[in-house]
C-alpha cells in the first residue's frame, strides 16, 4: 500500500460547501468538504462495485484515511482563533478574520458544513501576515534580545568557518561533528489487543561518503532488530514486540555518527547546462503526486526566470523568490496535502518540506537537477525535524541546499548564498528521496507518506497513527 495512488483535491485553504447528492463522485464531495457523504459513497462502492479493484481500491481506502487525518489537523473553531489573536490584537473584529482567510494567512476549511481551523492556524497567522509578524516581534522583543544560552551554536560564525576551511584546504568538507543519538518510540497502552505483535520502524542514518560517516549502532530495545541496507533511500531499523495489557510498548535505538559541513565555492560563469538524457534524467523529471510541472508553476517560472539561461543564476532567482515569498509556517501532515508545491504557491507559506519541494520542482522545470534530503537539524541547544535538498551544478556536481535557511543576512555575497551550495555540520541525514519503500516493507498505510523522520508503527489490524504513540529524540555532541 506504500505506492498509493494520490488524489489531487483542491489546493484551496478554505474548502466551501457545495454538492449534496449522495451519489456524487467522492472526489467532488471531498473537495467540497462533505466528508461524511464522501465516506458513505466510498464505502458503498467498495462493498458493492465489483469494478473497484487494484490501485483504485487502494486509493479509495486511503481517502477515508485522509479525511480522518484532516479532521485531526483541523480541530479549532473560530472562537479558539479569536481568543489567541486577541492577546496580540485586542480590537480584532470578524472582518479581520475574513480578510486573513481570504488572503490565506489563516488556514481553515469547511468540514461537513462547519468551518474548522488548522490546529496551528492562529500561531501561524503571526508568521505569515506581515503586520501580525511585526506585532509579534514587538511583543517578544525582550525575549529576542536575550543573549544566547551558554554553549549555543552561532550558526553564521559556524558556516563562515566551514567556508574558510574548505577554501583553505581546497576540499568541500570540513568541521566534522560527532554525535550520539538515542531515539525512542513509545506506543500508548492498549492501542492493540494484548499479545499482538507491534511492528516498529525507527529512522536510521545513511552512510554518505565524506558527508555522514562512522555510523555505529550501540544498542537497541528490543535487542533483536533488522537494519535496512545503506542503499535504502529512506533507511530504517526494524523491531517487533508484543503488546502487554495496560502497559506502553517501547522501542529504541542508540547510535553514533559523524557529520561534516560542506561548502562548494561556485563560480557562476563556469556553470553550464546538463545533458537531460544523462544519468541525471530522473532528477529532471516529474514525480507524482508532488513534483508536477503544473501550468501555474510553469507560468511562475517563466515570469521569474525571464531570459536568464545560466543554471546557477536561475537557481539563485528561484531560491531568493521562495525565501522571500513563502515564509516558514507550521504545516499540517503531508499526507493530507495533495500537492505540496501548489500548496506553497497558492497559500504563500509552508514548512521546510513544502518550501523545499517547491524549489525542487521549479529547478527541475528549468533543467536543473534537484532532489530531496531530510532528517533532523541541530542548533544546540535546540533540535527539530527538517527537510532540505541537493542540487546539481555542472561541473561541480551535487551540492547541498537549504531554501528554508535561505539568504543569510550579510553583506558578504558568497556567505549570503552559502545555503545554495553548502551545509552546516549539525545535520542527521535519514532520507535521500521521498516516499520510498522500507525494509522490511510496511503492510498498511504509512503515517507519513512523503518523508521519514519520526518513524512508523503498525500491527496486523492496521497502521498506528501519530496520535497513538510518542517519539523522543535525545542527543549529545561528542566532539566538534
Language model regions located:
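Intrinsically disordered, low-complexity N-terminal segments that are enriched in acidic
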Residues: 63-263
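Bacterial Sec-dependent signal peptides at the C-terminal "C-region" and cleavage site
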Residues: 9-21
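Alpha-helical solenoid scaffolds that mediate protein-protein interactions
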Residues: 45-46, 52
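Active-site rim recognition segments
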Residues: 365, 381-480
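Acidic low-complexity segments
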Residues: 33, 229-237, 243-346
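Active-site neighborhood of thiol-dependent amide/isopeptide-bond enzymes
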Residues: 307-388, 392-395, 409-412, 416-420
Amino acid at each position: 500500500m506504500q505506492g498509493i495512488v494520490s488524489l489531487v483535491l483542491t489546493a484551496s485553504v478554505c474548502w466551501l460547501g457545495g454538492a449534496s447528492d449522495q451519489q456524487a463522485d467522492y472526489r467532488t464531495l471531498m473537495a467540497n468538504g462533505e466528508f461524511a457523504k464522501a465516506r458513505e459513497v466510498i464505502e458503498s462502492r467498495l462493498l458493492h462495485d465489483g469494478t473497484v479493484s487494484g490501485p483504485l481500491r487502494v486509493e479509495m481506502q486511503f481517502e477515508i484515511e485522509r479525511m480522518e487525518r484532516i479532521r485531526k489537523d483541523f480541530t479549532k473553531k473560530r472562537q479558539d482563533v479569536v481568543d489567541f489573536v486577541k492577546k496580540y490584537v485586542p480590537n480584532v473584529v470578524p472582518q479581520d478574520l475574513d480578510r486573513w482567510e481570504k488572503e490565506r494567512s489563516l488556514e481553515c476549511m469547511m468540514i461537513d458544513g462547519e468551518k474548522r481551523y488548522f490546529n496551528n492556524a492562529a500561531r501561524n497567522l503571526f508568521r505569515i501576515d506581515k503586520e501580525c509578524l511585526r506585532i509579534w516581534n514587538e511583543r517578544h522583543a525582550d525575549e529576542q534580545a536575550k543573549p544566547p544560552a551558554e554553549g549555543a551554536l552561532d550558526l553564521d560564525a559556524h558556516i563562515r568557518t566551514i567556508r574558510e576551511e574548505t577554501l583553505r584546504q581546497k576540499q568541500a568538507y570540513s568541521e566534522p561533528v560527532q554525535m550520539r543519538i538515542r531515539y525512542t518510540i513509545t506506543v500508548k497502552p492498549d492501542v492493540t489487543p494484548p499479545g499482538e505483535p507491534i511492528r516498529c520502524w525507527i529512522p536510521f542514518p545513511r552512510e554518505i561518503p565524506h558527508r555522514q560517516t562512522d555510523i555505529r549502532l550501540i544498542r537497541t530495545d528490543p535487542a533483536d532488530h533488522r537494519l535496512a541496507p545503506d542503499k535504502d533511500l529512506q533507511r530504517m531499523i526494524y523491531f517487533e514486540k508484543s503488546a502487554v495489557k495496560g502497559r506502553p510498548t517501547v522501542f529504541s535505538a542508540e547510535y553514533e555518527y559523524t557529520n561534516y559541513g560542506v561548502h562548494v565555492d561556485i563560480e557562476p560563469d563556469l556553470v553550464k547546462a546538463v545533458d537531460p538524457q544523462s544519468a541525471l534524467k530522473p532528477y529532471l523529471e516529474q514525480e507524482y503526486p508532488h513534483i508536477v510541472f503544473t501550468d501555474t508553476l510553469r507560468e511562475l517560472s517563466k515570469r521569474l526566470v525571464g531570459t536568464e539561461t545560466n543554471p546557477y543564476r536561475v537557481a539563485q532567482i528561484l531560491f531568493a523568490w521562495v525565501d522571500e515569498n513563502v515564509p516558514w509556517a507550521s504545516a499540517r501532515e503531508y499526507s493530507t496535502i495533495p500537492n505540496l508545491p501548489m500548496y506553497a504557491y497558492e497559500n504563500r507559506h509552508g514548512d521546510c518540506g513544502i518550501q523545499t519541494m517547491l524549489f525542487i520542482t521549479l529547478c527541475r522545470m528549468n533543467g536543473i537537477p534537484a532532489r530531496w534530503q531530510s532528517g533532523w537539524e541541530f542548533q544546540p541547544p535546540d533540535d527539530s525535524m527538517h527537510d532540505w535538498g541537493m542540487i546539481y551544478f555542472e561541473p561541480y556536481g551535487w551540492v547541498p541546499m537549504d531554501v528554508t535557511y535561505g539568504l543569510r543576512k550579510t553583506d558578504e555575497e558568497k556567505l549570503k548564498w552559502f545555503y545554495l551550495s553548502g551545509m552546516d555540520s549539525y545535520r542527521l541525514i535519514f532520507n535521500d528521496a521521498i516516499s520510498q519503500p522500507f525494509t522490511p516493507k510496511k503492510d498498511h498505510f504509512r503515517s507519513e507518506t512523503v518523508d521519514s523522520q519520526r518513524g512508523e508503527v503498525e500491527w496486523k489490524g492496521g497502521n498506528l497513527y501519530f496520535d497513538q504513540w510518542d517519539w523522543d529524540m535525545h542527543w549529545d555532541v561528542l566532539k566538534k
